[in-house]
Amino acid sequence: MLNYSKSEKAFKEAKKVLPGGVNSPVRAFNSVDATPVFMDHGKGAYITDIDGNEYIDYVLSWGPLILGHANPSVVDAITKAAMKGTSFGTPTEIETELAKLVIERVPSIEIVRMVSSGTEATMSAIRLARGYTKREKILKFEGSYHGHGDSLLIKAGSGVATLGLPDSPGVTKGLAADTITVPYNDVEGAKLAFEKYGEEIAAVIVEPVAGNMGVVPPIEGFLEGLRDLTTKYGALLIFDEVMTGFRVDYYSAQGYYVVTPDITCLGKVIGGGLPVGAYGGKKEIMEQIAPAGSIYQAGTLSGNPLAMNAGFETVRQLTPQHYDVFRSLIKRMEEGLTEISTRREVPISINKAGSMFGFFFTDQKVINFDTAKTSNLEFFRNYYREMLNQGIFLPPSQFEGVFISTMHTEKEIDKTLEAFDHTCKTLRG
């Protein structure tokens, strides 16, 4: 049993000054009935807490750290930029350089606007879609998280295509009424929604690989079907690649699945661990944004030079060969988890995409939020705490994706599988 006494003390202090003791809800460890671990430093594939416990890190700051912790080139880029000044509120050349790199790698993007978070990117993309199409309704998918913008915090009702209800106090019924929600991977549900509301729908926003119900890839024909529907009805297709951008493939998820959206939202990896977001797309659409056009969006720290330098250095280092290694390592993980769970009689369903994967304690194939919710959450809670005590740091929620970095090797995968085997043996008796 690891010692967490310093983290426990730090959490008590944090709760005096922060809501729930954290600055983002999942960090509170509520879903695993544990005290959150306070981190001190990270290096490569490892992270160390304030009690001195070292873990193999599969959270990687919720995805951004694709090169691992404290990558020397990224740290050097940030340090050099900071020595020149942390922010100017004016254009800098590094903004243009990162924009060129993003445009080169992401098939749908001809022009890109930098912002400060993934939430800001999706909120701005929705406003752009509404302004461009002169329509108001948005279609999203149940269980998909697109940041905490009011228009997107909507819970699905019953039926195939139901106008939503607010999923958080403070979200107005008026905003909820403009958001249509259908199950993920359900093209027929989307078709019915368009048949009923097609002339009112400004855009469909979708994660090409869902990452906030666990990792759920698109079934064959799903993304293609959405592309066809939006084109037919004159709506825009928005890919939320905040999580999947540069995670699923060298050319992001849209390059891997060969489906081109009208607007793409990015974040996480393109900031190299610093706060950043971006949205981009076709020139004729993006030039509607001020000051080129009349659709307003602005930000004090948009294009912050520290984030731009960190992002540029991160994306610059990635090569197609990295993704071959990612897939090989995750295949090794999948095969090991499958063998152990079969031997230990633990039902498991595994999904993967590039450098992301997810697993659910269920015998059902997980293709949407309903099937994701069949996972045994009580088993997950116990499993999580046991894995943590063996030095494996995983997302403290069943419904979050798991990530690897260029610093993860077969050594880390095999150690994780050993811990998984021990955990299953312990929990199954």
UniProtKB/Swiss-Prot annotation:
According to its UniProt record, this protein's enzyme class is isomerase
GO BP, sorted A to Z: protoporphyrinogen IX biosynthetic process
Task: Give the keywords, sorted.
Answer: Cytoplasm, Isomerase, Porphyrin biosynthesis, Pyridoxal phosphate
Alphabetically, the GO molecular function entries are: glutamate-1-semialdehyde 2,1-aminomutase activity; pyridoxal phosphate binding; transaminase activity
Q: Can you cite an annotated GO cellular component?
A: cytoplasm
Pathway where this protein functions: Porphyrin-containing compound metabolism; protoporphyrin-IX biosynthesis; 5-aminolevulinate from L-glutamyl-tRNA(Glu): step 2/2
Indicate yes or no for the key word Repeat.
Answer: no
Give the modified residues of type N6-(pyridoxal phosphate)lysine: 268
User: This protein's superkingdom?
Assistant: Bacteria
Q: What is its EC number?
A: 5.4.3.8
Under the heading HAMAP family, the entry gives: HemL_aminotrans_3 (MF_00375)
Task: Outline the subunit composition.
Answer: Homodimer.
Q: Which family does it belong to?
A: Belongs to the class-III pyridoxal-phosphate-dependent aminotransferase family. HemL subfamily.
User: What PANTHER family does the record point to?
Assistant: GLUTAMATE-1-SEMIALDEHYDE 2,1-AMINOMUTASE (PTHR43713), GLUTAMATE-1-SEMIALDEHYDE 2,1-AMINOMUTASE 1, CHLOROPLASTIC-RELATED (PTHR43713:SF3)
Q: Quote the protein name from its UniProt record.
A: Glutamate-1-semialdehyde 2,1-aminomutase 1
Species assigned in the record: Listeria welshimeri serovar 6b (strain ATCC 35897 / DSM 20650 / CCUG 15529 / CIP 8149 / NCTC 11857 / SLCC 5334 / V8)
